[in-house]
Amino acid sequence: MNSMSFLISTLFDLYIMVVILRIWLQAARADFYNPFSQFIVKATQPVIGPLRRIIPSVGNIDLATVLFAYVLCVLKFVVLILIASNGSVSFSADFLFLGLLSLIKAAGGLLFWVLLIRAILSWVSQGRSPIEYVFHQLTEPMCAPIRRIIPAIGGLDLSVLVLFIGLQFANFLMGDIIGPIWFQL
């Protein structure tokens, strides 16, 4: 059962990251004509399209997509418990709380990976990659304020490193507040 749980958890996590990327692309007003953005939109549109007709947006927040990401996180735990318990599960409010925690952790994990890929691409492609352009649009609102406080030293931008440290601190802080379950999400 561990192999099945791993596979299902990974598939859920990957799709949750794609849905969170869609939310982030909209919030950052990133280039939607970019090939990477088009992939994200096409991968989520079959579900998000009908949901957006039912659930309206609130300001810049696409509530339908946020709700869908949350439901996916809750559903992930329900399915994993079903597998672990051989098909019997009683729904609990704990699933709702775990879903929220999982969504928060997935967003932080996605930020980490986007920052890491952006840093690597900045050394390799030097601005010629369409993915790098979108990742720059996504992360620049977080890097720019840090860059005002800590300017580049010798041409080396430390804002991404500061964000990495901040993300790790937040991760360990959540582990201290919530307990060991945070690291198992």
From Swiss-Prot:
Subcellular location field: Cell membrane
Transmembrane helix among the record's keywords? Answer: yes
Protein family according to the UniProt entry: Belongs to the YggT family.
**Sorted UniProt keywords:** Cell membrane, Membrane, Transmembrane, Transmembrane helix
Organism equals: Vibrio alginolyticus
Transmembrane domains' residue ranges: 5-25, 63-83, 97-117, 149-169
Q: What is its main location?
A: membrane
Answer yes or no on keyword Transmembrane: yes
The identity of this protein, by name, is Uncharacterized protein in proC 3'region
One Gene Ontology cellular component: plasma membrane
Entries under InterPro entries matching the protein: CCB3/YggT
Pfam families assigned: YGGT
In what way does this protein cross or attach to the membrane?
Multi-pass membrane protein
Top-level lineage group: Bacteria
